[in-house]
Amino acid sequence: PASPQKRAASPRRSPKKSPRKSPKKSPRKRSASP
């Protein structure tokens, strides 16, 4: 069970599949732009 648990953490940490964690797509920078 320790093997599949490490795999699930691999794609979760990946900022490529997680655009919400990506600071590039963050709407915070768009809000500063008038």
Curated annotation (Swiss-Prot):
Main location: nucleus
Ranges of compositional bias, category Basic residues: 9-34
Tissues expressing the protein: Sperm.
Highest taxon above the source species: Eukaryota
Localization terms from the record: Nucleus; Chromosome
Location of the region described as Disordered in the Swiss-Prot/TrEMBL record: 1-34
Keywords in alphabetical order: Chromosome, DNA-binding, Nucleus
Cellular component terms (Gene Ontology): chromosome; nucleus
MF (Gene Ontology): DNA binding
Keyword check for Cell membrane: no
Function: Histones H1 are necessary for the condensation of nucleosome chains into higher-order structures.
Similarity annotation: Belongs to the histone H1/H5 family.
Name the UniProt record assigns to this protein: Histone H1, sperm
